[in-house]
UniProtKB/Swiss-Prot annotation:
Its EC number is 2.3.3.13. Catalyzes the condensation of the acetyl group of acetyl-CoA with 3-methyl-2-oxobutanoate (2-oxoisovalerate) to form 3-carboxy-3-hydroxy-4-methylpentanoate (2-isopropylmalate). Signal peptide: none annotated. This is 2-isopropylmalate synthase. GO terms for cellular component: cytoplasm. Residues 205-331 are annotated as: Regulatory domain. GO terms for biological process: L-leucine biosynthetic process. Keywords: Amino-acid biosynthesis, Branched-chain amino acid biosynthesis, Cytoplasm, Leucine biosynthesis, Manganese, Metal-binding, Transferase. It catalyses: 3-methyl-2-oxobutanoate + acetyl-CoA + H2O = (2S)-2-isopropylmalate + CoA + H(+). Homotetramer.
Length: 331
């Protein structure tokens, strides 16, 4: 700052990349040396190895505020929820060991660590998980839970702006899933809400999906999809159940986008966990990410495909940057 002409009248900003894993450290060094602004991104996403992660630098400044004497206006209790939203909409998963927002950030497996945390959490936790909005669910929500308890759980997760109609639809979907798999965890409930609140998630509606597959059998799928032009029924074979379902869906909706990404993950660790499928579809210059949530992976796969296809069909897709090969061809 001392080297900049009229340095006291300008805001110095840091813009760091994580090529050597030093993006957050370099940004904090900038603050120590007079920077008043940090350019950062949620989950550290960005070019090459990424940029400085907002959640890391914000919590570092908060936890070590006595040292940095710097403050932000970030509502830290929304960090975890926003991180998961970015993960969902970009299709870029948060690594389990990611600082602040990773699944393991507040997990303790070592016996001596567990003992220490039980006696005094600050022994191994530099911050309270609730500071970033990670709070354990107080209520156990299952098939016998009422609407009032369901709505209270949503409010505890930060969903306080839902309309009565939205709560009604979410509750109906929750009861449907709870009947199949049992109680839902806070993480599963959040995934359910986000998948159902998507504006294009109902552009194409999955009415029915069934498939036949097994050793020596040709994988075959039948789907019924509700489109803006009415219901469509289609049957197709494929290399596996998911491939057969996707080919049947393409025939039903009249779109044949290219599948660029397909990822399956369990929202929690048990065999009864909700499955979350993320897909990225490309249609010409357009691309869209879709997410499906269900205790049935095949159904979740179908929901994810229809979610992304709905964005492509409804004009809510993003423009896909050309590949190196396309640039060379002059596309």
């Amino acid at each position: 700052r001392d080297e900049v002409v009229r340095g006291r009248d300008v805001v110095i900003s840091t813009h760091t990349h994580d090529d050597l894993g030093m993006a957050t450290a370099n940004a904090l060094a900038g603050v120590e040396n007079g920077a008043g602004q940090i350019e950062c991104t949620i989950n550290g996403i960005g070019e090459r190895a990424g940029n400085c992660a907002l959640e890391e630098v914000v919590m570092a400044l908060y936890v070590r505020r006595d040292w940095y004497k710097a403050y932000t206006r970030i509502n830290t209790r929304e960090i975890y929820r926003v991180s998961r939203l970015v993960e969902r909409y970009t299709g870029m998963p948060v690594p389990p060991n990611k600082a602040i927002v990773g699944d393991n950030a507040f997990a303790h497996e070592s016996g001596i660590h567990q003992d220490g945390v039980i006696k005094h959490r600050a022994t191994y936790e530099i911050m309270d998980a609730e500071l970033i909005g990670r709070r354990p669910a107080v209520l156990v929500l299952g098939k016998h839970s009422g609407r009032a308890a369901f709505k209270k759980a949503l409010e505890d997760l930060g969903y306080k702006d839902l309309s009565e109609e939205e709560v009604k639809k979410l509750f109906a979907r929750f009861k449907e899933i709870a009947e199949k798999k049992g109680p839902l965890s806070a993480e599963e409930l959040q995934a359910l809400v986000e998948s159902e609140r998507e504006p294009t998630s109902h552009f194409f509606q999955l009415e029915h999906v069934q498939f036949f597959s097994g050793s020596g059998l040709l994988p075959t799928a039948t789907v019924k999809v509700k489109t803006p032009d009415g219901e469509r029924l289609a049957t197709h074979t494929g290399d596996g159940p998911v491939d057969a379902v996707y080919k049947a869906i393409q025939e039903a909706i009249g779109l044949r986008p290219e599948l660029e990404l397909y990822r399956v993950e369990a929202i929690t660790g048990s065999t009864e966990a909700l499955g979350q499928v993320t897909v990225r579809l490309r249609l010409g210059e357009l691309q869209a990410v879709g997410v499906g949530v269900s205790p049935d992976i095949i159904e979740a796969s179908a929901l994810a495909f229809l979610d992304a296809a709905g964005k492509l069909a409804s004009g809510r897709a993003t423009r896909h940057p050309p590949s190196i090969e396309e640039v060379h061809r002059g596309v």
